[in-house]
Design a protein with these regions (language model features):
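A short, Lys/Arg-rich alpha-helix, primarily the initiator
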Residues: 1-19
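Base-recognition residues in the alpha-helical recognition helix of bacterial helix-turn-helix
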Residues: 37-41, 52, 70
Length: 75
């Protein structure tokens, strides 16, 4: 079975968020999450984001999604 996973470029994601002046809470709210830990776990690579979340993050940060996330195919 082929599985696609998103690999997070944690350093670039954190840098872009900080440059825009957003907190973890701001990012989580934008994603519709109740806890700021939701975004923190994505940013630190502890949790793989859903495709929709990755797209929302890149939209808010006004950067191409490929700056922060790469798709890796596993077989």
């Amino acid at each position: 079975m082929i599985k696609e996973i998103l690999i997070t470029n944690t350093e670039e994601l954190k840098k872009a968020r900080e440059l825009k002046g957003f907190s973890h809470r701001d990012m989580s709210k934008f994603l519709g999450a109740k806890s700021s830990a939701t975004y923190y776990n994505i940013e630190t690579g502890k949790v793989e984001p859903k495709i929709g979340q990755a797209l929302k993050i890149s939209k808010l940060l006004k950067e191409p999604v490929t700056n922060f996330f790469k798709i890796k195919v596993q077989q």
